[in-house]
C-alpha cells in the first residue's frame, strides 16, 4: 500500500476540434504505440462519417452511444471463507465512462469493415441506436450482476 495516497487525477484538456473532453478520452483509447496523430485522424474521421450518416452533431451522437453502453452495475470477485463470490456493485461514473469507451473501441476493432474509421463510426452509430456488440456487453454485465444479486450483501 502506498503511503502517499492515490495519485492525483491529471486534468483532461478539451479536444481542439470539438471542444469536448469525451472526444479527448476517445482519442486516448484509440491510441496505440504513441501514434496520437493517427488516433486523432481515426476518431475525427469516424465522427465526420457519423455526422454524414445522421446529419446531427457527432458529439451528441457519441454521448448517446456512451449512454447506451455505460454500465450501471458490475460484478467484483470477493473471497469469503474459501469460496469466491461474484458480488454485484454499482459502477462509479468515471469508471462507467472509461468502460464504455474501452468496450466501444475494443468491439469496433473486432468489426469486419475495411478501415478503422468505418468500424469506429459504425460501432458508434450502432451503439447510439441501442445495437452493436458494445451494447450487448453492457447487457451481459447487467445480467451477470442480476444473476448474482443473492451475494449483494457481501458488498464492501
Swiss-Prot record:
Protein source organism: Mycobacterium ulcerans (strain Agy99)
HAMAP family on file: Ribosomal_uS7_B
SUPFAM superfamilies assigned: Ribosomal protein S7
Name of the featured protein: Small ribosomal subunit protein uS7
UniProt similarity note: Belongs to the universal ribosomal protein uS7 family.
GO cellular component: small ribosomal subunit
Pfam families recorded: Ribosomal_S7
One of the record's GO molecular function terms: tRNA binding
Gene3D superfamilies xrefs: Ribosomal protein S7 domain
Alphabetical UniProt keywords: Ribonucleoprotein, Ribosomal protein, RNA-binding, rRNA-binding, tRNA-binding
One GO BP annotation of this record: translation
Subunit structure comment from the entry: Part of the 30S ribosomal subunit. Contacts proteins S9 and S11.
Primary role: One of the primary rRNA binding proteins, it binds directly to 16S rRNA where it nucleates assembly of the head domain of the 30S subunit. Is located at the subunit interface close to the decoding center, probably blocks exit of the E-site tRNA.
